[in-house]
Amino acid sequence: MHLLCFLSLACSLLAAALIPSPREAPATVAAFESGLGFSEAEPDGGEVKAFEGKDLEEQLRSVSSVDELMSVLYPDYWKMYKCQLRKGGWQQPTLNTRTGDSVKFAAAHYNTEILKSIDNEWRKTQCMPREVCIDVGKEFGAATNTFFKPPCVSVYRCGGCCNSEGLQCMNTSTGYLSKTLFEITVPLSQGPKPVTISFANHTSCRCMSKLDVYRQVHSIIRRSLPATLPQCQAANKTCPTNYVWNNYMCRCLAQQDFIFYSNVEDDSTNGFHDVCGPNKELDEDTCQCVCKGGLRPSSCGPHKELDRDSCQCVCKNKLFPNSCGANREFDENTCQCVCKRTCPRNQPLNPGKCACECTENTQKCFLKGKKFHHQTCSCYRRPCANRLKHCDPGLSFSEEVCRCVPSYWKRPHLN
C-alpha cells in the first residue's frame, strides 16, 4: 500500500514539473528553459545559466531511483511526504503557499500501473550481483578432451545498467563458492571423477569509471571498495543567496534550477517544496517543522520565550514602554524595565528605588564628629570659635571638640 502511495505521489510531482497550468505556462517554460541554459540574455549571463543547467542535467542523469529523482527536484516536499508516510498517512496540500493558488497536478497523464512498472524495471536493471550460468570449461580453459557434468554452474556476477555511459558495472568484493562436479576425460580410461572446484562469486557491485577499474585491477593490495557511492567529503556549507547545498553533487547549486513553476521575476527562496518556511526545517523524527539551528525554548534565556511562528526569542511579559513608570525604560534585551535616571555627583543612583539618594546622613556624620548638610548631602565641621594656638606638652588641639586633648587621643590624618 505504501508503495502504491509512493508511486502515486511520484506521478503527481513529475507531472507538476512537466505540465504547468495555462495561467502559469509562460513563467514555467521560462524558468525551465533558464534551468537548461536556453536563454537569450547577455553572453555572460547565458554562460552562467548554461552552467547551472548543466549541473542540474548532470544531477538528474546520475539519479538511480524514483526516490533520488524526487529528492533532487523536490527535496523538502519529498522528505515531508516520506516522513508522513512512515507515520501512517499523507495529506497532499491543496494550496501553493507562495501564491495562494491551488496546486494543479496532471496526474491523469500517468497511472499507478505504469509508474509501478517503471519503478520495477528501474530496480531490475540496476548494477548488482545477478545469478548467472557459466560454462565450467570456458571459465577455467579446460583441455578439449576434458569436460564436466553438469557443464554449467550457477554463481553471482555483477551486471546491470549504470546511469552514465562512462561507467561500468564492476565487482567491488568477491567470495568463492566450492562446487562438486564430474570430470570426464576421453578416451575414457576411467569412470567420471568427482572434483571440487572453487568459483568466483561477486558479493557487491558498483558503477565505476575506467580509471577506477584500472586502479582496482592493478591494485597491489586487494581490498573491497565501498559498495555505495562516496558521500560528500566536506560538510554541508552555507551557500550564497539563491543557492542551495546539494548532497548529491557536493556543492552549491542555483536554486532556480529546482523551481520550475515560479515566475521569472520572483526569485524568492520560499519555493513550493520549501514546506516549512524560511525559518524552519523538517524534523524527520517527529515529522514536524521546527526552528532552524536547534533553537528551543530553553535557549532563549530568562524573561523570554520562543515564538514558534517566527522562530525568534521574544519577551514573555509583553510589557510596553509606557507601562514602566517615571524615569524607567523598557530594555528589549533583558525584557525588563530599567532605571534611566541621571543623578548629581553627590547623590548616586539607587537602582532598586530608581532615586537619587545621599550617601551620608545625620548618624554617619555624627560618628565622624561632623554635622550633616542636607543641601549638599555631605558632612561638614564647624570651625572652632576659640582656637588655642598652644597646648601644654603632651596635649594637642582637637578640631572636633575645640580644646586640647591628650595627643594619643588624636586620630591620625588619613590621606
From Swiss-Prot:
Classify the main location: secreted
Q: Which GO terms describe its biological process?
A: angiogenesis; animal organ morphogenesis; cell population proliferation; cellular response to leukemia inhibitory factor; epithelial cell proliferation; glial cell proliferation; induction of positive chemotaxis; morphogenesis of embryonic epithelium
Disulphide linkage map: 127-169, 158-205, 162-207
Q: Where in the cell is it found?
A: Secreted
- For the region 4 X 16 AA repeats of C-X(10)-C-X-C-X(1,3)-C, give the residue spans: 276-358
GO terms of molecular function: chemoattractant activity; growth factor activity; vascular endothelial growth factor receptor 3 binding
What is known about the tissue distribution of this protein? Answer: Expressed in adult heart, brain, spleen, lung, liver, skeletal muscle, kidney, testis and intestine with higher levels in heart, brain and kidney. Isoform 4 levels are very low. Isoform 3 is mostly expressed in liver and has reduced expression level in other tissues. Isoform 2 is mostly expressed in brain and kidney, although a lower level expression in other tissues is also detectable.
The protein's job, in short, is: Growth factor active in angiogenesis, and endothelial cell growth, stimulating their proliferation and migration and also has effects on the permeability of blood vessels. May function in angiogenesis of the venous and lymphatic vascular systems during embryogenesis, and also in the maintenance of differentiated lymphatic endothelium in adults. Binds and activates KDR/VEGFR2 and FLT4/VEGFR3 receptors.
Subunit structure of this entry? Homodimer; non-covalent and antiparallel. Interacts with FLT4/VEGFR3; the interaction is required for FLT4/VEGFR3 homodimarization and activation.
Q: Which family does it belong to?
A: Belongs to the PDGF/VEGF growth factor family.
Protein name per the record: Vascular endothelial growth factor C
* Organism whose genome encodes this protein: Mus musculus (Mouse)
Taxonomy of origin reads: Eukaryota, Metazoa, Chordata, Craniata, Vertebrata
